[in-house]
């Protein structure tokens, strides 16, 4: 089953899917209305009128697919949660992870099902986004999962000392 994930500020397919769902029927091209996509942390998927719309709708219908959206807060927190596991993801993958979490919580994805999340960019391309999340300076975003940055010098002794200070403060 295919799942389409969109940022809430750039969600025309999600809106079309919700319209079809409210009428208890499959998604159709005539459900779609282009939108002017708003600013989103997931800038590469800021698309209000996808050129591949007919293919996307055919794929969703053929696979009994669903469409979900993620808010800016949800995508930012999903990225921070993933970072804590060693996955260093981009905001676009954060949209997918946030939507995945929502679908699991609603039971649309069962715990015994296998899921593949395709990440097309690396977090290193989005270091400013990550640093601002953890510093609590992203506009309109709370940072409940922030891992506060620690300033330190570049000498090994300074790095070791900074690590000890952080660890000692946690004990």
Task: Give the ranges of each region predicted by the language model.
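Extended hydrophobic secondary-structure segments that form protein cores and membrane-embedded regions
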Residues: 1-7, 116-120
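Active-site/ligand-binding loops adjacent to catalytic centers
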Residues: 3-91, 133-171
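Claisen-condensing/thiolase-fold acyl-transfer catalytic domains that form or cleave C-C bonds
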Residues: 72-128
